[in-house]
């Protein structure tokens, strides 16, 4: 382990259009191969699509979607003796937000709409309404943690 301790976390800068670090984090998750301007265009157009469809502030839609996708429990592998147990642990707030954004972008990419803008718009709207594959992923994660509750005493 380095003597200086862990590297400090860099703060996420707020984006210029909405002034929200969440939008910047979403842009960073959509970003591929350094094409930031393309990622920004996708995210901003998707958020405008949310505004057009719902008539509300897209930041509110994004926050509601994140709240519906954000996991509170997950399982971690822990080796005890010769066996590996799936131990349920609580998810730290920063990790839960990161996981939620990652899942939303991942399942948006798997959708069947023509453009990424449409896919992301629909995934955000579905997630904000408690539907969609990203919400199902959270439910599956919680179900897995609940079914392995017997191993909770192996927590570290």
Curated annotation (Swiss-Prot):
Naturally occurring in which organism (per UniProt): Acidothermus cellulolyticus (strain ATCC 43068 / DSM 8971 / 11B)
Name used for this protein in its record: Small ribosomal subunit protein uS7
GO BP: translation
Keywords noted in UniProt: Ribonucleoprotein, Ribosomal protein, RNA-binding, rRNA-binding, tRNA-binding
Gene3D superfamilies per record: Ribosomal protein S7 domain
Biological role: One of the primary rRNA binding proteins, it binds directly to 16S rRNA where it nucleates assembly of the head domain of the 30S subunit. Is located at the subunit interface close to the decoding center, probably blocks exit of the E-site tRNA.
Family note: Belongs to the universal ribosomal protein uS7 family.
Assembly behavior: Part of the 30S ribosomal subunit. Contacts proteins S9 and S11.
A Gene Ontology cellular-component term: small ribosomal subunit
Origin organism lineage: Bacteria, Bacillati, Actinomycetota, Actinomycetes, Acidothermales
NCBIfam families per the UniProt record, alphabetical: rpsG_bact
Residues in the signal sequence: none
Ribonucleoprotein as UniProt keyword: yes
Molecular function per GO: rRNA binding; structural constituent of ribosome; tRNA binding
PANTHER family: RIBOSOMAL PROTEIN S7
Highest taxon, organism lineage: Bacteria
């Amino acid at each position: 382990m380095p003597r200086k301790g862990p590297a400090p976390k860099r703060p996420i800068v707020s984006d210029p259009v909405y002034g929200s670090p969440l939008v910047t984090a979403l842009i960073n998750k959509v970003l591929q191969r350094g094409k930031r301007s393309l990622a920004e265009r996708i995210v901003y157009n998707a958020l405008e699509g949310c505004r057009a469809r719902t008539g509300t502030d897209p930041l509110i839609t994004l926050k509601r979607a994140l709240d519906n996708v954000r996991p509170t429990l997950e399982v971690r592998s822990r080796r005890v003796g010769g066996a590996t147990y799936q131990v349920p642990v609580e998810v730290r707030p920063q990790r839960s937000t990161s996981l939620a954004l990652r899942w939303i972008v991942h399942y948006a990419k798997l959708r069947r709409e023509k453009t990424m803008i449409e896919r992301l718009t629909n995934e955000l709207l579905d997630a904000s309404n408690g539907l969609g594959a990203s919400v199902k992923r959270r439910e599956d994660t919680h179900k897995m943690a609940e079914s392995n509750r017997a191993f909770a005493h192996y927590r570290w």
